[in-house]
């Protein structure tokens, strides 16, 4: 089966992630949260190609919960309800991790619909956006999430990955 190069080279651990030392370095807050395994709702923002999706996948793996990925440009509330259908069963007794890419494309009502699932623990939301979340994300979702900024990757950051 064909697998894109980016997926074949995607890091599997925090130590393999390129850049983002300010949050993933040895004393980085996000590193500590992920290593702790009890991950809150998170919002990642920054330019494309900075590792937001990769870090979300690594975080979800630490939680040992089912991981679902949706893109807000094409997803609907029905998709979210379908994902939460197995919560509480043997398939997902402790809830699921939902990675919602491009959350800024969900309108206010769609973002509000996430609250019920976030508050009762059916979903641990990890959302990403290229927009400033303080303008693009509904306030109630934002207040229930921890926000991290991902910065552009520099040539210096990329060198260790190229050498690998």
Residues covered by each model-derived region:
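Conserved beta-strand position immediately N-terminal to the Walker
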Residues: 15, 42, 148
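Conserved AAA+ ATPase "SRH/arginine-finger" region at the nucleotide-binding site
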Residues: 71-73, 146-159
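Walker B beta-strand of ABC/ABC-like P-loop ATPase nucleotide-binding domains
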Residues: 98-100, 114
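A short, basic N-terminal segment
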Residues: 1-36
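Walker A/P-loop
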Residues: 1-3, 32-70, 85-88, 115-120
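Short glycine-rich substrate-engagement loop in P-loop NTPases that contacts/grips substrate
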Residues: 23-27, 65-97, 108
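Conserved catalytic/switch belt of AAA+ P-loop NTPases
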Residues: 31-35, 109-143
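Structural recognition of the conserved hydrophobic beta-strand(s) that form the central parallel beta-sheet
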Residues: 70, 99, 124-128, 149
């Amino acid at each position: 089966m064909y697998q894109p190069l980016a997926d074949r080279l995607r890091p599997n651990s925090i130590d393999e992630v390129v850049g983002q030392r300010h949050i993933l370095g040895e004393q980085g807050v996000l590193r500590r949260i992920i290593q702790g395994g009890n991950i809150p709702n998170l919002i990642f923002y920054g330019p494309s190609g900075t590792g937001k999706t990769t870090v979300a996948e690594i975080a979800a793996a630490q939680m040992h919960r089912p991981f679902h990925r949706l893109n807000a440009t094409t997803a609907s509330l029905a998709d979210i309800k379908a994902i939460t259908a197995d919560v509480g069963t043997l398939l997902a007794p402790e809830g699921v991790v939902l990675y919602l890419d491009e959350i800024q494309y969900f309108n206010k009502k769609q973002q509000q619909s996430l609250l019920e699932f976030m508050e009762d623990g059916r979903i641990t939301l990890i959302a990403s956006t290229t927009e400033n979340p303080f303008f693009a994300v509904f306030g109630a979702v934002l207040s229930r999430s921890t926000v991290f900024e991902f910065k552009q990757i520099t040539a210096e950051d990329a060198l260790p990955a190229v050498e690998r």
